Each structure stands twice: as C-alpha cells, then as structure tokens.
C-alpha cells in the first residue's frame, strides 16, 4: 500500500466545525436565519467557508472552513449570529484533510485572511 497521492488529486488541510443547536432552535432560528445565511454566503464567496449546512433534525450544523489554525476556524463560529444569540449552544472544531482537485485549492496569493495554506 502506497501513501502516494495519484495525479489530479490534492489534499487540503482544513477544519470541520460542528455547531450544536439549542433545544429551542426551531423557534429561535427563523429570526436570525437571514443574517446567518448572508454571512455564510459572504464567507463562501471569500473562500473561507467551503460548505455549510444543518442536519434536518436540527441537532447540529457542519461547516468546512479554511483557516490558519483551529482558533481561527472556531472564530468563524464565534462570530456567527447563531452562537451569539443562542441558536447554537456549542461549537467544536476538528482538523480535516479534504480530497480535492489541485485547481480547487487556492495558492498562497489567493488565500483569504486567516485561511490555511496548503
């Protein structure tokens, strides 16, 4: 078994944030959702958030984030209206290695502030 990465494949170190919803999130989320979604869209456009979404049962949300370290990744959640207003009660961050095409991973000049280098 080889550790060699096949041609056309790149490995990008990123972070996964899992944010746990409060028990009353079904009631509190709607009033904050437009602000939350606008921010996520802006972070996606900036290349900081790669993917984001919630589990249908509102147990938690997942975000895939480019950041220089775990603290910077966690700041993405800390700065979100959902965590500030109690829609999320906790956010955890874990390092993750994403399999991607080389052209999907920005070079050093393309990195948004606080984003991880490859």
Would you name each region that the model predicts?
Residues 2-118:
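Conserved, structured core segments of small domains
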């Amino acid at each position: 078994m080889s550790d060699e990465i096949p041609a056309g494949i790149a490995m990008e170190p990123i972070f996964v944030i899992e944010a746990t919803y409060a028990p009353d999130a079904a009631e509190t989320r709607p009033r904050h959702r437009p602000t939350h979604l606008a921010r996520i869209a802006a972070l996606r456009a900036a290349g900081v958030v790669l993917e984001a979404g919630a589990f249908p049962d509102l147990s938690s949300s997942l975000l895939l984030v480019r950041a220089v370290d775990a603290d910077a990744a966690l700041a993405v959640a800390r700065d979100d209206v959902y965590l500030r207003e109690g829609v999320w009660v906790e956010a955890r961050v874990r390092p993750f290695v994403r399999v991607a095409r080389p052209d999907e991973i920005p070079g050093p000049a393309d990195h948004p502030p606080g984003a991880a280098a490859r």
